[in-house]
C-alpha cells in the first residue's frame, strides 16, 4: 500500500465547522483516484499514532488538486486537530486513495444518478456529482441533501453555481430540520415518505439505468434503502458509504465447546510475508496484529472502508459487520480483518 507525504495547497472554510483541505500532487507521480473514494490521513497527536479516512470531495475529472473535506466532530481527536492546526504549506502523510463507493463515469452513458445524503455525507456525493456531470453530458444528477440549518450546508455556494451551470441536468433538493423563517426549501428530516414523494415529483428516476448513492448517518441510509426497495428499486442499484468510526465490537454468542471461545493461531500473508500469531477470544484479527506491531493495512476499524480487506483461504471467521462487503465478495471468502474473529482452527488470510 502506497504512502505519500502531501503538501497542503489550500485550506478553505466551507462552514463554521467544516474545511476543505486540498493538496499538491507529489513531484514523482500524480495521485490517482476515482470519484467517491477516500484518503486516509496518518497523524501522531500527543504521541498517539492515529489514522482517519476522509472522503475526497474533489473530482479527478474537474479538479487539478485532490482534496478532502473534514467536518468537526465534537470531542473528535483527528477532525478537531486537522481543522485547528493544518495550514497551507504543511505536509500530511496519507495512504493511497481507496474505497469501493465510487463511480466510473462513461461518456456513452445516458442515465440518472440519484445522490441522497445528510451533513458531511455530501463529501463523496459532491465528487460523484461533479464527475458525472462533466463526463456524461447526456446524464442527469439528482441530489437530496438534508441538514439542520442553512448555514451548515457544506458546498452551498458550489451547489448553487452547479445548478445554474447545468440547468435541468442537476436537480438539488435541500431539506432542513431547523430552518430560518425565510427558508424556502424543504422542511424536516429526510424520511421514507419525503424521499419517495420527492423522487416521484422529480420523475424519470425509476428507470433500470438509474443508480442510487447514499452517504450519511447509518439511520438515514437504512431508512433510505428501505424506502427505495419498497418503491421497487433493485438492491444492486443502491450503493452506500458509512462514516462510521471504530467502536467496541459486539460479543457473539457461542457454546462452551465452540472454538471461537479459544485462543486461535492464525496465519496472515501480506506483501510477500507470512505472519503467524494468536488471536484471543472476542479479539479481532486486526487488533491482535497491531498489538504485535504487525503492520497490516487498515483505516476506519469499523468494517466499512474495506482498507483491511483480505481473503479467508482456510478455516472460518465471523464478521461483526458485513455491510462493507458485497454479497459476491462475501461468497468468495473476502473478509475485513478489523471486524473478523477466527471461528475455527487453521484460519489463513491472504491480503493483496
Where on the chain are the PLM-derived regions?
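Iron-sulfur (Fe-S) cluster-binding segments and ferredoxin-like electron-carrier domains
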Residues: 288-292, 307-352
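Iron-sulfur (Fe-S) cluster-binding modules
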Residues: 1, 7, 13, 17, ...
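Active-site proximal loops enriched in glycine and acidic residues that flank catalytic Cys/His/Asp
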Residues: 174, 216, 224, 242, ...
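Ferredoxin-reductase
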Residues: 2-95, 108-111, 139, 147-150, ...
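FNR/FR-type flavoprotein reductase catalytic core
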Residues: 80-258, 265-267
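Ligand-binding loop in jelly-roll beta-barrel domains
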Residues: 60-64, 106-109, 136, 342-352
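C-terminal accessory/binding modules appended to enzymatic or scaffolding proteins
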Residues: 261-304
Amino acid at each position: 500500500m502506497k504512502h505519500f507525504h502531501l503538501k497542503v495547497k489550500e485550506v478553505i472554510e466551507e462552514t463554521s465547522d467544516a474545511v476543505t483541505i486540498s493538496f499538491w500532487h507529489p513531484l514523482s507521480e500524480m495521485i490517482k483516484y476515482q470519484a467517491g473514494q477516500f484518503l486516509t490521513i496518518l497523524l501522531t497527536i500527543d504521541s498517539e499514532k492515529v489514522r482517519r479516512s476522509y472522503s475526497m470531495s474533489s473530482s479527478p475529472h474537474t479538479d487539478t488538486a485532490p482534496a478532502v473535506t473534514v467536518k468537526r466532530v465534537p470531542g473528535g481527536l483527528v477532525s478537531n486537530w486537522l481543522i485547528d492546526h493544518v495550514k497551507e504549506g504543511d505536509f500530511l502523510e496519507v495512504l493511497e486513495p481507496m474505497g469501493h463507493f465510487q463511480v466510473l463515469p462513461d461518456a456513452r452513458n445516458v442515465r440518472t444518478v440519484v445522490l441522497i445524503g445528510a451533513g458531511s455525507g455530501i463529501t463523496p456525493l459532491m465528487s460523484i456529482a461533479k464527475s458525472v456531470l462533466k463526463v456524461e453530458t447526456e446524464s442527469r444528477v439528482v441530489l437530496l441533501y438534508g441538514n439542520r440549518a442553512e448555514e451548515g450546508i457544506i458546498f452551498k455556494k458550489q451547489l448553487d453555481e452547479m445548478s445554474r451551470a447545468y440547468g435541468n441536468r442537476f436537480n438539488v433538493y435541500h431539506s432542513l430540520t431547523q430552518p430560518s423563517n425565510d427558508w424556502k426549501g424543504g422542511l424536516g428530516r429526510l424520511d421514507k415518505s419525503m424521499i419517495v414523494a420527492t423522487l416521484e415529483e422529480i420523475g424519470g428516476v425509476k428507470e433500470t439505468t438509474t443508480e442510487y448513492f447514499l452517504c450519511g448517518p447509518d439511520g438515514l441510509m437504512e431508512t433510505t434503502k428501505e424506502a427505495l426497495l419498497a418503491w421497487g428499486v433493485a438492491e444492486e442499484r443502491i450503493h452506500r458509504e458509512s462514516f462510521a468510526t471504530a467502536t467496541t465490537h459486539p460479543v457473539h454468542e457461542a457454546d462452551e465447546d465452540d472454538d471461537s471461545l479459544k485462543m486461535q493461531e492464525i496465519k496472515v500473508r501480506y506483501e510477500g510475508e507470512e505472519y503467524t500469531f494468536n488471536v484471543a477470544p472476542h479479539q479481532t484479527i486486526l487488533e491482535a496484529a497491531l498489538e504485535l506491531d504487525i503492520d497490516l493495512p487498515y483505516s476506519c476499524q469499523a468494517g466499512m472502508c474495506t482498507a483491511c480487506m483480505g481473503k479467508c483461504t482456510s478455516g472460518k471467521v465471523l464478521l461483526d459487520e458485513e455491510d462493507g462487503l458485497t454479497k459476491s465478495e462475501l461468497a468468495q471468502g473476502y473478509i475485513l480483518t478489523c471486524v473478523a474473529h477466527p471461528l475455527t482452527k487453521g484460519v489463513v488470510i491472504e491480503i493483496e
